[in-house]
Design a protein with these regions (language model features):
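Bacterial N-terminal signal peptides that target proteins for export
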Residues: 1-11
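Flanking scaffold residues of small Cys/His-coordinated metal-binding clusters
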Residues: 15
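C-terminal motif of bacterial Sec signal peptides marking the signal peptidase cleavage site
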Residues: 18-22
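Bacterial signal peptide processing site
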Residues: 23-27
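Alpha-helical segments in soluble extracytoplasmic regions
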Residues: 33-116, 129-153
């Protein structure tokens, strides 16, 4: 297998792992369960951001074709959106979890929006837009990492 083919296989595997790590079902969950759902959502979104960044950086370095980058980034954006939607379908069990939900909403929405912007720029083949969108992931990535720390208490 050529290096690009191997890289595409690795990225596809990473993206598939991100997609398979999702939360199933909806409804109210106990306090610890809700915190775990928030932490898992933040982790999935962090992995999606890392996957998208890696794909774009490899493309910018000339090590991956734009079409493969487009697939990688599109899958990352879809995975983050799916994780956000799954969490939105969960009802917090109590006041502390409701507060956590309020804390989680903006970082999750910002990260999903940033990944969508990157996906759109890659889809257009807009190199300047790709660079701006890639930089635009920095803040949301930090916010989601902080959310994960808050949700896990670490």
């Amino acid at each position: 297998m050529r290096p690009r083919g191997q890289l595409a296989t690795v990225l596809a595997g990473l993206a598939a792992g991100v997609g398979l790590s999702g939360c199933a079902g909806h409804g109210s969950v106990a306090a610890a369960g809700y915190r775990a759902n928030v932490a898992q959502t933040a982790e999935r979104i962090s992995l999606a951001i890392a996957s998208a960044r890696m794909g774009v950086q490899l493309d910018l370095d000339g090590k991956m074709a734009l079409a493969v980058t487009d697939q990688t980034v599109s899958h990352a954006a879809a995975s983050a959106d799916s994780a956000a939607s799954a969490l939105a379908g969960r009802e917090p069990a109590g006041e502390a979890e409701t507060t956590l939900r309020r804390q989680a909403t903006a970082p999750i929405q910002d990260a999903v929006a940033a990944l969508r912007a990157l996906r759109d720029a890659v889809g257009r083949g807009d190199r300047g837009g790709i660079g701006r969108a890639l930089s635009g992931l920095d803040g949301p990535a930090r916010e989601v990492d902080e959310l994960r720390r808050v949700a896990t208490g670490r």
